[in-house]
Amino acid sequence: SNPDFLKKELGQAGLRLWFHANGIDESNVHKPYKAKSHGLGNSQILPRDYVKQRDIEIILREMAEQVAIRLRRAGKKTTVVSIHLGFSKQEQKRSIHTQMKVEPTNNTSLLVSYVLKLFHSKYTSGAVRSVAVSYSGFVDESFALISLFDEVDKLEKEERLQTAIDSIREQFGFTSLLKATALEDASRSIARSKLIGGHSAGGLDGLK
C-alpha cells in the first residue's frame, strides 16, 4: 500500500501501520507525533436565571448543534465533549465543568445526546446563568469507526440530511432552519443571531 494514501485516510495511525507492516523502525524516521489540543466551543451569559431543567436543556441543545456545524465546516470530528454551567450568584454553588471521551463524531444528534448526558450526570438543581459547550481532541472527518452494531444505513441517511441542512444554513443563514423550541421563551437562537450578524458576540462564531 502507498504510505501517503494510508496517512491521508487514517492519519498518523495509518503511517505507523505501514511502517510496522514493512518492518521499519518509525522512531528513526520522524519525531513522535503530538496532537495539538485545539478546541471549538461557544459560551454565553444568559439574560436571566434559568431554573427549569427543560429550559437549560434547550440552551444546551442549541449550543451543541451550533458547535457541531462549525466542527463539520472545519472538516473535523471530536473525541472529547465538554460542558460548563455557571450558577447565579444567589445560589452560592460551585460551577459545573465536566467532559467525556467519545468515539470520533461530528453528528449533531450524537453530540446533543452526549451534551445532555453530561448535564444529567452532574446537574441536580439551581439557577443557571452561564453555559458553555466545547469539543476537542479532533481527528479528520474521514476517520470512521464502524462496529457490527452500527446501523450504517441510518447513519448515512442522517449524514445526508445533516449535509443538506448545513447547505441551506450556509446559503440563507443559521436561523433559516430552526426547531420548534426556538420559539419558546428559553431559546436564545434567534436573539443571539441578531447580535452583530450572529457572529462572535452572539456566540454563533462562523455561522451566518
Question: What residue spans do the PLM features occupy?
Answer:
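DNA-contacting surface of Y-family translesion DNA polymerases
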Residues: 1-126
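Acidic, metal-coordinating catalytic segment for phosphate/diphosphate chemistry
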Residues: 97, 101-208
